[in-house]
Amino acid sequence: MSESGHSQPGLYGIERRRRWKEPGSSGPQNLSGPGGRERDYIAPWERERRDGSEDPSTNVMQKTPIILSKPPAERSKQPPPSTAPAAPPAPAPLEKPIVLMKPREEGKGPVAGTGASTPEGTAPPPPTAPAPPKGEKEGQRPTQPVYQIQNRGMGTAAPTAMDPVVGQAKLLPPERMKHSIKLVDDQMNWCDSAIEYLLDQTDVLVVGVLGLQGTGKSMVMSLLSANTPEEDQRAYVFRAQSAEMKERGGNQTSGIDFFITQERIVFLDTQPILSPSILDHLINNDRKLPPEYNLPHTYVEMQSLQIAAFLFTVCHVVIVVQDWFTDLSLYRFLQTAEMVKPSTPSPSHESSSSAGSDEGTEYYPHLVFLQNKARREDFCPRKLRQMHLMIDQLMAHSHLRYKGTLSMLQCNVFPGLPPDFLDAEVNLFLVPFMDSEAENENPPRAGPGSSPLFSLLPGYRGHPSFQSLVSKLRSQVMSMARPQLSHTILTEKNWFHYAARIWDGVKKSSALAEYSRLLA
């Protein structure tokens, strides 16, 4: 109470009324006079609040949020990022620590280890709920590089059952060919079946053969590649000319046949050049000629030139087989094929226009002259010198490598001759008749019923045996240098595609087209 007898304003406020209204008896607590209780009851405390609520407890709850709203404001002042966009950086520090890298290393074990890795990340309790899905995603990421490392290092270590099979298949040797297949068919079309036997490796030697009809090209290529003289000729990889075919005067090989050995040596057997049987087949069977050729003999010669020019471009070694010495038309044909051969200049010399620079970058294979079915007098030193001298004079203007890479003197075929016996030694090799070995099975006898003469010594033949000569020829051919065919190093498969482009270019060659017009 004040000195004037009135109550102070702060004594009968809301807090004061809360004290006497909570017990529930308002009569004895009315100390302000007869109208004081009504004044206190009608006082505009609730009207000023404009809430319409008569419960005092609600007023207290309305103030408490105001009081509680201050601590969040104070809390927001302490951390600088208090706004909602600050939430994304929160998981970022969770990814920065290396705690997530530990389950990656442990993820190499069983899958149960991934579940055990989640309690390790309990340091930040709020992201415990999203941590498992992140752990699963992060656990899947390291499994991929680990899988790749295992494949690179181990080769056969892989979780699936097919990977060991693939790894073992890569370690297995390539499939061995049992017979030759077509590289160019009888219609002079390219065949793609040979690429299945090729690999991606660069150590490959390509050997081709040229020769007239009936000289024994297929037999020589079979003996050099996979067969021996003791085997049946019907089992040769390159089918030789049968007796019936010889009687008819026909040719056995048509187009170009392909065979590759386990030593990665490619052998290309070809149809006979300038073949009369092919010409007879064109004339008698009324076979339609291509529109650019008018006469059958022109078409036969152009086919032969296309095959020879193709071999001069894609082969390391070209063997020219003859069965007698010698045919001058064969050397004219070789010079013509060299003239129309596709050029293979280096890219750095493509812009050069001088002929000398082009000759320096041109590719030419090794040329080997094989004298098949040689007689005894052919192995005479005097006759041997004449043969070398004649070939050297006929090929004097050729850029083909016809000398310096094969020698019969160095392989001890003529043990009594000195190395400098031949003034101009060319790549010439002599092989006798294969059937001559059968003559030694019946040694000469003095009489019909007498014992054989010189039974302990072999009969005189004037040359080594057929098997030994073929073996020496094979060793010399396989040991020849392998010059680079193009300006880039070619693998087996790259060589196949390169040969396909060369064959297509040979068929469309402008030089061959011009030469065919001159023949017509």
Swiss-Prot record:
Organism: Mus musculus (Mouse)
Protein name: Nonsense-mediated mRNA decay factor SMG9
Ranges of biased composition (kind: Basic and acidic residues): 36-53
Single Gene Ontology BP annotation: in utero embryonic development
Gene that encodes it: Smg9
Record lineage: Eukaryota, Metazoa, Chordata, Craniata, Vertebrata
Entry-linked Gene3D superfamilies: P-loop containing nucleotide triphosphate hydrolases (3.40.50.300)
PTM sites of type N-acetylserine: 2
Family: Belongs to the SMG9 family.
Pro residues bias: start-end ranges: 78-94, 122-133
Residues annotated with Phosphoserine modification: 2, 4, 7, 32, 53, 451
Region of interest: Disordered: 1-143
Function in brief: Involved in nonsense-mediated decay (NMD) of mRNAs containing premature stop codons. Is recruited by release factors to stalled ribosomes together with SMG1 and SMG8 (forming the SMG1C protein kinase complex) and, in the SMG1C complex, is required for the efficient association between SMG1 and SMG8. Plays a role in brain, heart, and eye development.
Membrane-crossing segments per the record: none
Domain of life of the source: Eukaryota
GO MF, one annotated term: identical protein binding
UniProt subunit comment: Self-associates to form homodimers and forms heterodimers with SMG8; these assembly forms may represent SMG1C intermediate forms. Component of the SMG1C complex composed of SMG1, SMG8 and SMG9. Interacts with DHX34; the interaction is RNA-independent.
